[in-house]
Swiss-Prot record:
GO terms for cellular component: cytosol; cytosolic large ribosomal subunit. The lineage of its organism: Eukaryota, Fungi, Dikarya, Ascomycota, Taphrinomycotina. It is found in: Cytoplasm. The modification Phosphoserine is found at S50. Residues 116-125 have a biased composition (Basic and acidic residues). Component of the large ribosomal subunit (LSU). Mature yeast ribosomes consist of a small (40S) and a large (60S) subunit. The 40S small subunit contains 1 molecule of ribosomal RNA (18S rRNA) and at least 33 different proteins. The large 60S subunit contains 3 rRNA molecules (25S, 5.8S and 5S rRNA) and at least 46 different proteins. It comes from Schizosaccharomyces pombe (strain 972 / ATCC 24843). GO terms for biological process: cytoplasmic translation. Its main location: cytoplasm. Component of the ribosome, a large ribonucleoprotein complex responsible for the synthesis of proteins in the cell. The small ribosomal subunit (SSU) binds messenger RNAs (mRNAs) and translates the encoded message by selecting cognate aminoacyl-transfer RNA (tRNA) molecules. The large subunit (LSU) contains the ribosomal catalytic site termed the peptidyl transferase center (PTC), which catalyzes the formation of peptide bonds, thereby polymerizing the amino acids delivered by tRNAs into a polypeptide chain. There are 2 genes for eL24 in S.pombe. Gene3D superfamilies: 6.10.250.1270, Ribosomal protein L24e (2.30.170.20). This is Large ribosomal subunit protein eL24B. Residues 96-149 are annotated as: Disordered. Belongs to the eukaryotic ribosomal protein eL24 family.
Length: 149
């Protein structure tokens, strides 16, 4: 047994009861009685009529039991190790004194600067060497051109 719902009042429409209204755009409306159909055709708002299900739902009528508020899950911070660092190592670093940490940072910076300076000086040496060889090659070319003339 298929029980329909009234398009206006929201009440149940049992088989063999109620009225069916088909609009020009083929939208079907089911009404429990002539009263609902008439009010629908008058374009009355069912939320403003106190006997409709929509009104009762909107104004929280007939809800007998007060159900408890839904509890939201709280996020809990949890520490765990990451790739390349164990949890013990992380805790140890966190518990270090600021002076020790600053000294370690300064040492790491100095090491990085020294490494960069070394690589730059190496690049300069290679560049100077290639420039000298290209200058020598250019001088030989110039000498050959001068010899032809």
């Amino acid at each position: 047994m298929k029980v329909e719902v009234c398009s206006f009042s929201g009440s149940k429409v049992y088989p063999g009861a109620g009225r069916l209204f088909v609009r020009g755009d083929n939208k079907v409306f089911r009404f429990v009685n002539k009263k609902s159909e008439s009010l629908f055709l008058q374009r009355k708002n069912p939320r403003r009529l106190s006997w409709t299900v929509l009104y009762r739902r909107m104004h929280k009528k007939g809800i007998s039991e007060e159900h408890a508020k839904k509890r939201t899950r709280r996020t809990v911070k949890h520490q765990r190790g990451i790739v390349g660092a164990n949890l013990d190592v992380i805790k140890e670093k966190r518990n270090q004194r600021p002076e020790v940490r600053a000294a370690a940072r300064a040492a790491a910076l100095k090491q990085r600067k020294d490494k960069r300076a070394a690589s730059e000086s190496e690049k300069k040496a290679i560049k100077a060497k290639s420039a000298a060889s290209s200058a020598r090659g250019q001088a030989i070319k110039n000498a050959k051109v001068a010899a032809r003339r």
